[in-house]
Swiss-Prot record:
One BP annotation, GO: negative regulation of autophagosome assembly
Residue numbers annotated as active site: C374
EC number of this enzyme: 3.1.3.95
Similarity remark: Belongs to the protein-tyrosine phosphatase family. Non-receptor class myotubularin subfamily.
Biased composition (Basic and acidic residues): 17-33
Known role: Lipid phosphatase which dephosphorylates phosphatidylinositol 3-monophosphate (PI3P) and phosphatidylinositol 3,5-bisphosphate (PI(3,5)P2).
Polar residues composition-biased segments: 1-16
Region (Disordered): 1-33, 577-602
Organism (species): Xenopus laevis
Cited InterPro entries: GRAM, Myotubularin, Myotubularin-like_Pase_dom, PH-like_dom_sf, Prot-tyrosine_phosphatase-like, Tyr_Pase_AS, Tyr_Pase_cat, Tyr_Pase_dom
Compositionally biased intervals (Low complexity): 584-602
UniProt xrefs under SMART domains: GRAM, PTPc_motif
Gene: mtm1
Protein name per its UniProtKB record: Myotubularin
Chief localisation class: cytoplasm
Amino acid sequence: MATSSTPKYNSNSLENSVRRSPGDGINHEQNDEISRLPGETLITDKEVIYMCPFYGPVKGRIYVTNYKLYFKGEEMEPLITFAVPLGVIARIEKMGGASSRGENSYGLDITCKDMRNLRFALKQEVHSRKQIFEDLTKYAFPLSHGLLFFAFQNEEKFPENGWAVYDAMTEFRRQGLPNDQWRITFINRNYELCDTYPPLLVVPYSASEEDLKRVAAFRSRNRIPVLSWLHPENQSAIMRCSQPLVGMSGKRNKDDERYLDIIRETNGQTSKLTIYDARPNVNAVANKATGGGYENEDAYPNAELVFLDIHNIHVMRESLKKLKDIVYPNVEESHWLSSLESTHWLEHIKLVLTGAIQVADKVASGKSSVVVHCSDGWDRTAQLTSLAMLMLDSYYRTIVGFEVLVQKEWISFGHKFSSRIGHGDKNHADADRSPIFLQFIDCVWQMSKQFPTAFEFNEHFLITILDHLYSCRFGTFLYNCETIRDKEKVREKTPSLWSLISSEKSKYTNPFYTKELNRVLYPVASMRHLELWVNYYIRWNPRIRQQQPNPVEQRYMELLALRDDYVRRLEELQISNSPKINRSTTSPSSPSQMMPQVQTPF
């Protein structure tokens, strides 16, 4: 077994897709040391043959730490190396047996959550893979083995505390809350009303605490309609909640009906409240059999119900699986378009974007308050509210604003990250797993392609978020809700992903960004305008990867750096000449008009 002494830490430690050569998707490295994070220790290592789908068998050694699997090749110049955070691993299987015949038929198959698979062949000796298999399984699935996530062992230090990015009260004040129509309630401060909601909620001013409790009894998981966003001018609101507990008998709840009417009355602009049910109509009807359902317009006469036809988590999971099958390891050029169409992935992206556009347009142009829900209000609901808010509010299109949006609409409102991603859990076939958050980020990327100057962050920012959605290096996406995060003391014991991003902000900044206040974005959601996100889904294929870095973006960055250098030198020149200017203006023999004003052309 390898020793656990730690080499000197490199802040640019290899992880996922760092330090690639320009020409392919494999990392090439000459350094003999394995870079490790503070708190990362080496567990074991083993000679293997990496069955590379692009270059064939590569002899080398894999190193397993408490955070990542690291492969370092031999016999090639330059060396092929890559690292996979253990949290990215979905499944580890043994390949072949002691009696297997054929070259490289004995080893390990590793399925990853980030669109790639790995295969390692080992020497066909007695128990030659036993130790490496057990160590990999133990540290890749810590919850299944009674261990802590690496985030709790991570000793990285950052200049800024990313946990301070989002403060609910600060965000409420930014939106002009509370006001004469809306109040902040502390009814959930101990998670007593709803254990998957945040402690602070915004509700209509005229709704009492008792009203909220009675409404909670009629909403799935007690997830009552609460405010997500308030339009600064027309005071239309985006509300989020779960489905009503109507059931097969078509139950009614006068408190819930009155509560939704109060929401309608808060803006006074329209006579109707629009309820967006993210589900297909048939699914919403089927939910009545399990006690759920939807708002009957007879019971809610001042509301309009619209179904958005977005499919459930199981359909999305199968769609991503089909997409992975066609993009890794090889792309079949002759049937590419038909194969992509058969996955229905872009169709699902279209439906999510279309739904969010409807929500945003109803609020901005229709000046109507809206209520958004799906079944439990933590999957499709989060997609719709956060995308609509991104379209409506330019603040969320900044780096910090987007972090606030994710913390608020996804993390604090109980999107089940642990269940959907399967953090630390070996049960790869769990039916709760689904790429809901990935779909959201994909939709954001689609918007950034259509509005290249509207977002302060770049593509690398979005990919970094997705990489650490799986990595378990940070506490940001761990667990299903704030109740559990508070219990596990995540904020106190783990670093935040936003700390990393704030420490290297220039890496994640879009050089084409132009700040525009009060601009509403309406992306085109037709199939002709949507693209497969090649730089994410096919980034592991060296033959498909697009040129990195983008030459236009690279040149623009160089020009910006040149401009900044000119501005700096100009400021230094002005400072150094300042005493001379002051003396000349007080001297009768040196009129001030003889000294020209120094200005920058930028």
